[in-house]
Amino acid sequence: MPKAAAPAKRATRTKRAKKDPNAPKRGLSAYMFFANEQRENVREENPGISFGQVGKLLGERWKALNEKQRAPYEAKAAADKKRYEDEKQAYNADQEEEESS
């Protein structure tokens, strides 16, 4: 007669540190700028479409763009990345200042 399998151990979740609500928001990617701009167009062209299908269509449209068509979104993403880095640097300086006080 086969032995009973040992009871499976439950995986314990590691606790994440709470996010500071005052921390700067991460910069958006070029795709996210594109998706935010095109989402309503996709919904209007395909009424009744599910959330997942909207994402698939947006992904297909993004992949179909050439470098020239992606350039404005890449520029927005670069500017947003710079904004995030500047805000994060200022935020970290404030945090260090508070810790030393």
UniProtKB/Swiss-Prot annotation:
Residue ranges of the annotated DNA-binding region, renumbered to this chain: 24-92
Disordered as annotated region, ranges: 1-27, 69-101
Domain of life: Eukaryota
Cell division keyword on record: no
Stretches with biased composition (Basic and acidic residues): 69-89
Keywords: Chromosome, DNA damage, DNA repair, DNA-binding, Nucleus, Transcription, Transcription regulation
Subcellular location, record wording: Nucleus; Chromosome
Entries under CDD domains matching the protein: HMG-box_NHP6-like
Biological processes annotated in GO: DNA repair
Gene Ontology cellular-component terms listed: chromosome; nucleus
Listed transmembrane segments: none
Molecular functions (GO terms): DNA binding
Stored InterPro entries: HMG_box_dom, HMG_box_dom_sf, HMGB
Primary location: nucleus
Pfam family, one: HMG_box
PANTHER family: HIGH MOBILITY GROUP PROTEIN DSP1 (PTHR48112), MITOCHONDRIAL TRANSCRIPTION FACTOR A, ISOFORM B (PTHR48112:SF22)
Self-association state and partner proteins as the record states: Weakly associates with the stable SPT16-POB3 heterodimer to form the FACT complex.
Family affiliation: Belongs to the NHP6 family.
Function: DNA-binding protein that induces severe bending of DNA. Required for DNA-binding by the FACT complex, a general chromatin factor that acts to reorganize nucleosomes. The FACT complex is involved in multiple processes that require DNA as a template such as mRNA elongation, DNA replication and DNA repair. Also augments the fidelity of transcription by RNA polymerase III independently of any role in the FACT complex.
Name of the protein in question: Non-histone chromosomal protein 6
Taxonomic lineage of the native organism: Eukaryota, Fungi, Dikarya, Ascomycota, Pezizomycotina
